[in-house]
Amino acid sequence: QRDLCGVLDEMRLVKDAHELALMRHAAQISARAHVRAMQHCAQALRAGQEVREYHLEAELLHEFRRYGAQAPAYNSIVAAGANACVLHYRADRAPVGSNDLVLIDAGCEYDGYASDITRTFPAGGRFSGAQRALYELVLTSQEAAVAATKAGARFNAPHDATVAVLAQGLLDLGLLDKNQHGSAQDVIERRAYFRFYMHRTGHWLGMDVHDCG
């Protein structure tokens, strides 16, 4: 008998045109769901209504099914305020304050293929100065990762690009002491950024949200 796992893993690693089309459609549905949740949050808070994390999760689920997705690709994460600092937060019960940042990590599954989107937004529709500074740093790091993602690039290239931007940004914002860390390279070598960014950047995606790779 031959173990087919290795063969199947190799088949799943490279997607054909049909698979890519399904993945793009799943991503489009998920993007609509994120926008719906953001809009509902700001509108409800401005109207003086209570908003809880599970209310935003319900908006996500509504949009997934509305556009034909069979299910969430994984348990959705909706984390308001300090809850967003908890990796893989699952409670989804806390109230959302108008001055909170809200992190949503959610994606749908469409015809067997997963999507995965994480976004952070100001619950009431406007950033404070400190929130905007952090958001723009993360956005710049994301743009660096996207620019580093290309055919023939090393798998680690997007992560390395992200960390380089974050390391310099943490120094510039004063979140890391320049007297202790003389340069962004020093921050990277000593992994001083790890307190704020302990994840990797990106993962394989396909029939599973963390697909074979």
Residues covered by each model-derived region:
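Active-site neighborhoods and metal-handling regions in enzymes and metal-associated proteins
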Residues: 1-213
